[in-house]
Amino acid sequence: MSSSAIKIRNALLKATDPKLRSDNWQYILDVCDLVKEDPEDNGQEVMSLIEKRLEQQDANVILRTLSLTVSLAENCGSRLRQEISSKNFTSLLYALIESHSVHITLKKAVTDVVKQLSDSFKDDPSLRAMGDLYDKIKRKAPYLVQPNVPEKHNMSTQADNSDDEELQKALKMSLFEYEKQKKLQEQEKESAEVLPQQQQQHQQQNQAPAHKIPAQTVVRRVRALYDLTTNEPDELSFRKGDVITVLEQVYRDWWKGALRGNMGIFPLNYVTPIVEPSKEEIEKEKNKEAIVFSQKTTIDQLHNSLNAASKTGNSNEVLQDPHIGDMYGSVTPLRPQVTRMLGKYAKEKEDMLSLRQVLANAERSYNQLMDRAANAHISPPVPGPALYAGMTHANNTPVMPPQRQSYQSNEYSPYPSNLPIQHPTNSANNTPQYGYDLGYSVVSQPPPGYEQ
């Protein structure tokens, strides 16, 4: 075995290590770099190793190998694409689909990879074997194929409003049927006790069932039916089982939602609405939780007794104690409810952390906008002499900076010194009056034409 083959083998085993719980893209790119050094020989070597890894029983190895295959097809040229689209390799992939020992989750992962490769190879007729394999999977195992993502049609006027209303009606009817079946089951349990009350309830439901639908049909959350991984900046990526909080409808078949602090749009055919609990169900849940919390003292006492017995070595005496048996018998039935409560509060914690992240992002964006607005209103600085250096007017005269106003420090004089002083006399009493030549004779008297 050559040194290059040894390097490829070691790199591939590292990238498809069963201990990896997710794809390590650094390891995958290392394999791609080694293959690109000699696509002819190294390509055959890596495909031989990939085929052996796909025959392993470890699902983790197969998942990592599928990711490596996609990366090789996208980064290592036409020679690797020919090998991946060969009849031998496509038959190996279909064998995983047909195998009864392969879990359905792994089969869906294989189907997703086949679809991705089929879309990548569709422009090359020589690679149509991968497209034929995907068509075969759709015929033989349609349950493995995810629905196509709908196009983003803008909502305009009446036509889009009617489509939105039809979609809302469909969601409302699905929720109403679920609630109706639940009510029928509850009525069947109570029929043996109170038959007249059951008849009255049927009459009330038959009289006005449609009036109760809108109050129960507000879709606030949806659950993902499939995995969706996207590179679009405005789209939301999620995994099967994730609960997405609905924010608004952006397109006809796309809604906007929030998940783990991220916001984006998602296709409606990838999710299903979550039935919001009624007031009665919420009250029952609170009562069950209250029962669990009321047993806290008993649980602590049992825990302390068992710990003390394990330290002293008196386990046999503790097991024979009827009080310990009674406490154990009262605590054990609470385990399913405790498990549900742990999941519930873990989800609430995740929602609160997601909301905190959304608020932090919104606050950061708001502060950035406020800073930009404040900077836009700041007046530009006054240009200094350096700005005018080298500038000339149209007549080639240099442009000089504006001169500063000079302030003289002369002493203050109450009267101007350059006005001639006159000494007229008042015609009434011949007393001399002093004034300045301002256009009338005496400053102390009003000017001519002035009316008091």
Curated annotation (Swiss-Prot):
Domain of life where this protein originates: Eukaryota
Compositionally biased residues, Polar residues: 393-433
Region annotation Disordered: where it falls in the sequence: 144-166, 187-212, 389-452
GO molecular function: phosphatidylinositol binding; protein domain specific binding; protein heterodimerization activity; ubiquitin binding
Membrane-protein topology: Peripheral membrane protein
Domain UIM: 162-181
Protein keywords: Acetylation, Endosome, Membrane, Phosphoprotein, Protein transport, SH3 domain, Transport
Complexes and interactors: Component of the ESCRT-0 complex composed of HSE1 and VPS27. Interacts with the ESCRT-I subunit VPS23, the UBP7 deubiquitinase and the E3 ligase RSP5. May form a complex composed of VPS27, HSE1 and DOA1. Interacts (via SH3 domain) with DOA1.
InterPro entries: ENTH_VHS, SH3-like_dom_sf, SH3_domain, STAM, UIM_dom, VHS_dom
Miscellaneous comment as given in the Swiss-Prot or TrEMBL entry: Present with 358 molecules/cell in log phase SD medium.
Domain VHS, first and last residues per copy: 15-145
Organism: Saccharomyces cerevisiae (strain ATCC 204508 / S288c)
Record-listed Phosphoserine modification sites: S162
Function: Component of the ESCRT-0 complex which is the sorting receptor for ubiquitinated cargo proteins at the multivesicular body (MVB) and recruits ESCRT-I to the MVB outer membrane.
Name of this protein: Class E vacuolar protein-sorting machinery protein HSE1
A single cellular component GO annotation: endosome membrane
Gene Ontology process terms (BP): ATP export; late endosome to vacuole transport; microautophagy; multivesicular body sorting pathway; positive regulation of protein maturation; protein secretion; protein targeting to vacuole; protein transport to vacuole involved in ubiquitin-dependent protein catabolic process via the multivesicular body sorting pathway
Protein family membership: Belongs to the STAM family.
Record-listed N-acetylserine modification sites: S2
SMART domains per UniProt: SH3, UIM, VHS
Stretches with biased composition (Low complexity): 197-207
Organism ancestry: Eukaryota, Fungi, Dikarya, Ascomycota, Saccharomycotina
Compartments where located: Endosome membrane
Domain (SH3) ranges: 217-276
Broad class of the protein's primary localization: membrane
Pfam families named among the record's database cross-references: SH3_1 (PF00018), VHS (PF00790)
